[in-house]
Amino acid sequence: MPKGNGKVIAQNKKASHDYFIEDTYEAGIVLHGTEIKSIRNGRVNIKDSHARIDRKGEVQLINLHIAEYEQGNRYNHDPTRSRKLLLHRKEIDKLIGLTQQQGYALVPLKIYLKNGFAKVLIGLGKGKKKYDKREDLKQKQMKRDVDRAIKDHMR
């Protein structure tokens, strides 16, 4: 199964608006306790999250919010703790070199279930400037207008 396929739980639609995504990587997430149950229920938010490589060479997912499981007891998990991502050493070494360049960031694009395991698709993105965002919106609007005109013409 290619990377990014599976049952999509959460998607970061704002990432393609804020970043030029140059490359994507599939990573596993280290979860504790009832976190997987909350993910399967779809109670996860990746809107404000990002990934970072720490000094030990491990990739951490920061600000990922997984809501507490309703049927969980007092041993429920912390919703916003940082979670370790599982990548191959070669991929981590490549990401270390790329993220040290100015303007690059690791952005989670979507969380999905693949063969029963929670995976995250992270993208290596370069931040867009304000004029880039405006240009994308103009192109999107022009495409929408053309499609609408073609549809009206076909009637």
Curated annotation (Swiss-Prot):
PANTHER family: SSRA-BINDING PROTEIN, TMRNA-BINDING COMPONENT OF TRANS-TRANSLATION TAGGING COMPLEX. Gene3D superfamilies: 2.40.280.10. This is SsrA-binding protein. PROSITE patterns: SSRP. Belongs to the SmpB family. GO terms for biological process: trans-translation. Keywords: Cytoplasm, RNA-binding.
